Amino acid sequence: MNQTRKVLVLADSDNTRIAAQSFNRKMDWEKLRNYLANPEEGRELIEMVIYVGMPPAKERFVEQRKFTEKFSYWAKSNGFMVVEQEGKAKGNEYQADVDVVMAMDAIELSLEIKPDIVVLVTGDSDFAHLAQKLRRRGIRVEVASVEQSLGKDLKNSANSVIDLISIFDEFRSKNGRKEHFRIGHTNVFD
């Protein structure tokens, strides 16, 4: 009999949303959660944390902030743990670095809840050292991303890579049409 493995999922919302949009898909967080912690594969989801960069509370970001607040509320209402990081204005854009917060939480939560697997939903190579650190503690690290946004250092630091192209194909198209955008084949990361 297979033993159930405890899974902790940590997702960079902006990185993941942009990856889905690059395939003309609307992000479906519930499908993603079910895909990454499938109980039929002997996985038990302990927690899924979504890291959200909040637009600054300034007049020029009002609409973006409302949209992001609405998403955060939805995610919390649907069983996700949400960590919001206030952004800083940089001209007409803003930057809300969730990387440091996500990395610190990954270490802290891993020490506290002792997952068997940590899934990092990001392609950002800034998380390569985190992946190595978790692996040194005996935790399996999986990176969920698409090839186009997966940094080489992160790919090489993880135990394995989960190709999100197949799950993105199940998401609703942003324009409502049924389109499929497969790049390569199912073993694109091998």
Feature locations, PLM:
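Nuclease catalytic cores that cleave nucleic-acid phosphodiester bonds
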Residues: 62-190
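Domain-level signal for Mg2+-assisted phosphodiester chemistry and nucleotide/NA-binding surfaces
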Residues: 1-97, 140, 149
